[in-house]
A protein has these predicted regions:
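Acidic/His- and Gly-rich active-site-bordering loop/insert found
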Residues: 2-95
């Protein structure tokens, strides 16, 4: 499993998601949408039933249901991350 996770993250960092400070769109570059769409497809392949991409801002939302018995109270967990990289440094060729 560790190797699968490592390979998945290496695939993500290889996507050039450099942002553009001069842009007035969200996300600031089309390249960032490539990663968003990749994440949506991977989550769906993993069996996550509720996955969507916000077409206006490029946000990816996924709801992973609890595998705990019905009615068992457990804390809610959220993952939040940027999909873009700094406009100051190229995002191309990352390995």
């Amino acid at each position: 499993m560790k190797e699968r996770v490592t390979q998945r993250f290496l695939k993500y960092v290889a996507v050039d998601t450099q942002s553009d400070e001069a842009s007035d769109t969200f996300p600031s570059t089309e390249k960032q949408k490539v990663l968003a769409k990749m994440l949506v497809e991977e989550l769906r392949r993993m069996g996550v039933p509720q996955v969507e991409i916000d077409e206006q801002y490029g946000y990816v939302y996924a709801k992973i249901l609890s595998n705990r018995p019905d009615g068992e109270k457990v804390p809610v967990l959220g993952f939040i991350a940027h999909m873009d990289t700094s406009p100051e440094v190229s995002g191309a060729g990352v390995k």
